[in-house]
């Protein structure tokens, strides 16, 4: 089978993005390049931003500075393999109306707090799940913004934020062994 990152790159390859940049550690350059995606460029990240505790924003800003990027950036996460080309294209289309975009899913779950009280519904007027509007949750699949503002705010989202709603099954994120 294909590695986890393949599914994200494949969906991006067929999307409306002009260029795909993958930030990797040096030992993985040849491994990534063997997949021959025509839009693909590989960026070798600084070892200080290759640690498990490194923030995504640190890698983004490092890339922006190193390559002098002045462009719109779609940050896609390889840990969200169920993101489809149409999801990326939907976010790209929405972007013209917003400063930044975050992908989300609608959850229709009833949430309780640590004290034993419901957080998102009235205990004595519980809606049917089918009638429950639910709430939107980041699924971590992708974010869109401009390099200048990402750097200025040191954040992947800022300003007027658009929420790109995706199918509920895209909530899956594979960040740790427990997620498998």
Residue spans of the language-model regions?
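Conserved core of the sugar-phosphate nucleotidyltransferase
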Residues: 56-62, 69, 81-168
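Short beta-strand/turn micro-motifs composed of small residues
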Residues: 24-25, 77, 104-105
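Residues at the starts of beta-strands that form the adenosine-phosphate
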Residues: 18-20, 72, 99-100
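Hydrophobic helical membrane-anchoring modules
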Residues: 165, 169-180
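N-terminal glycine-rich phosphate-binding loop and ensuing alpha1 helix
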Residues: 1-23
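Short phosphate-binding loop-to-helix
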Residues: 27-74, 82-90
């Amino acid at each position: 089978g294909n590695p986890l990152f393949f599914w994200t790159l494949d969906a991006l390859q067929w999307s409306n993005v002009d260029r795909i940049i993958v930030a990797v550690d040096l030992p993985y350059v040849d491994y990534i390049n063997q997949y021959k995606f025509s839009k693909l460029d590989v960026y070798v990240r600084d070892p200080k931003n290759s640690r498990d505790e490194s923030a995504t924003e640190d890698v983004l800003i490092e890339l922006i500075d190193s390559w002098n990027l002045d462009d719109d950036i779609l940050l896609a996460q390889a840990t969200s393999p169920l993101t489809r080309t149409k999801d990326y294209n939907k976010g790209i289309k929405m972007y013209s109306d917003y400063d930044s975009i975050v992908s989300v899913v609608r959850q229709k779950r009833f949430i309780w707090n640590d004290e034993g009280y419901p957080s998102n519904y009235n205990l004595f007027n519980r809606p049917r799940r089918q009638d429950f509007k639910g709430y939107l949750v980041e699924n971590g699949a992708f974010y869109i913004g401009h390099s200048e503002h990402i750097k200025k705010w040191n954040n992947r989202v800022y300003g007027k934020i658009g929420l790109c709603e995706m199918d509920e099954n895209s909530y899956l994120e594979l960040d740790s062994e427990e997620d498998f």
